């Protein structure tokens, strides 16, 4: 039988993969993907704990995170497209070329 520990281990591993992607990658698009992996790992943890404690708060919070992540992707992808049109690169090191 799959217990709570198994879900939390998978959630922790996914979060570590996302964190490693955030620290290792220089591409803005891959940073967004890594952020989404970390958010999904958090959702797995919330839903697993919610299921095993018979409390719906974790599931409601996971739905809220999904909604926030969807809006983040919509806004972030729009900004990435504009960034690529202007600078022809998605490299994070070119961020210091911004003037403000």
Swiss-Prot record:
Gene3D superfamilies: 1.10.287.3510. Belongs to the complex I subunit 4L family. One of its GO terms (molecular function) is quinone binding. The chain crosses the membrane at residues 1-21, 28-48, 64-84. This is NADH-quinone oxidoreductase subunit K. InterPro entries: NADH_UbQ_OxRdtase_chain4L/K, NUOK/Mnh_C1-like. It holds the Pfam family Oxidored_q2. NDH-1 is composed of 14 different subunits. Subunits NuoA, H, J, K, L, M, N constitute the membrane sector of the complex. The keyword Transport applies. Keywords: Cell inner membrane, Cell membrane, Membrane, NAD, Quinone, Translocase, Transmembrane, Transmembrane helix, Transport, Ubiquinone. Disulfide bonds: none annotated. NDH-1 shuttles electrons from NADH, via FMN and iron-sulfur (Fe-S) centers, to quinones in the respiratory chain. The immediate electron acceptor for the enzyme in this species is believed to be ubiquinone. Couples the redox reaction to proton translocation (for every two electrons transferred, four hydrogen ions are translocated across the cytoplasmic membrane), and thus conserves the redox energy in a proton gradient. It catalyses: a quinone + NADH + 5 H(+)(in) = a quinol + NAD(+) + 4 H(+)(out). It is found in: Cell inner membrane. It comes from the Bacteria. Its EC number is 7.1.1.-. Coiled coil: none annotated. GO terms for biological process: ATP synthesis coupled electron transport. GO terms for cellular component: NADH dehydrogenase complex; plasma membrane. It comes from Helicobacter pylori (strain Shi470). It is a multi-pass membrane protein.
